[in-house]
Curated annotation (Swiss-Prot):
Active site as annotated: 79 (nucleophile)
Gene field: truD
One example GO MF annotation: tRNA pseudouridine(13) synthase activity
TRUD domain residues: 154-306
HAMAP family registered for this protein in UniProt: TruD
Species this chain originates from: Pseudoalteromonas atlantica (strain T6c / ATCC BAA-1087)
E.C. number: 5.4.99.27
Catalytic activity: uridine(13) in tRNA = pseudouridine(13) in tRNA
Family: Belongs to the pseudouridine synthase TruD family.
A Gene Ontology cellular-component term: cytosol
Name the UniProt record assigns to this protein: tRNA pseudouridine synthase D
InterPro entries: PsdUridine_synth_cat_dom_sf, PsdUridine_synth_TruD, PsdUridine_synth_TruD_insert, TruD_catalytic, TruD_insert_sf, TruD_pseudoU_synthase
GO BP of this protein: tRNA pseudouridine synthesis
Amino acid sequence: MQINHWQYLSSKPESTGIFKQQPDDFVVQEILGYEPVGEGEHIYLWVRKEGLNTAYLAEQIAKFAQLPLRAVTYAGRKDKHSVSEQWFGVHKPGKAEYDWSALNVPGATVLKAIRHNKKLRTGVLKGNKFTILMRDVTPSDDLAQRIAQVSLSGAPNYYGPQRFGDSRYDPKGSNLMLAEKMINGEVIRNRNKRSMAISALRSWLFNEVLSERINAGDFAQPLEGDVMSLAGNASYFVSDDIDDTIKQRLATRDITISAPLWGKGELASTGSALAFEKSVVMNHPKITKTLASLGLEQERRPIVLYPSNLTWAWEQNNLRIAFELPAGTFATSVLREILNVESVDTGPSE
């Protein structure tokens, strides 16, 4: 199972740049989507971290607060090889407060502490803001045009390479290699590795369907029976008739075309869209059978990713680019449409 063959929206970029040469080349800030109210039994911490993975920092916060690890939550994991500003939640009923400036974890600083009346849960993020410095960029005639095109028309909403892992740092293989063992009948007993392998397998199949849709020339062209995702939530509906209203809603980004996240049961699509999706997944019967047997439900994911508030500027021969993305999407999927990314060997991200 390979991950380097998926189609570009246009052609492969000519420009090349070095990605994440140092942590502050990749700055991520969470966008929570709501404001903590200032009271309640949960303490929300706004933390800047560098060179730390999210789970490790959660452990250190729990130790400092003398609380069980289950009392500390976060909305999403952030790359170890970055400068990240993210929220942590600490369940601490009562009036007692902490001097968070005394949290002595090299690479971490608590910027703000405020109470809220609800637990910070995984998946509540509205999105993330990325500020990325690509170093030693080789210029090309179409670089500015590519950036403008991505800003206007979006990028394929591929799962990024982080989802599939890297076998260089695990002698037993990457997430995708573990997934291959799983579909061939091997039992993965480590719960965390099993979960990552399942996620990688499902993501890989989604990327396959998306890539084939681009290859067929139907990335932006709705098919009869397409499943449309509503912007900003997980709701969707089947469009059996591609009329002017549907086309207008697609143009205004009120809805987007989706592709399947495989699970048990029947595909939600109908007609031409159903025929297309079946034509792709039928080539991977072991994968579909494995995912269905795990009890996962059929779900959908938009095929297009729209970066918002995109800005860029040259800094000598480096390119600084900033944009915001919805939660659950990958900055690398935007970057790959603009230039060839050469990642520095920094080790595993989590």
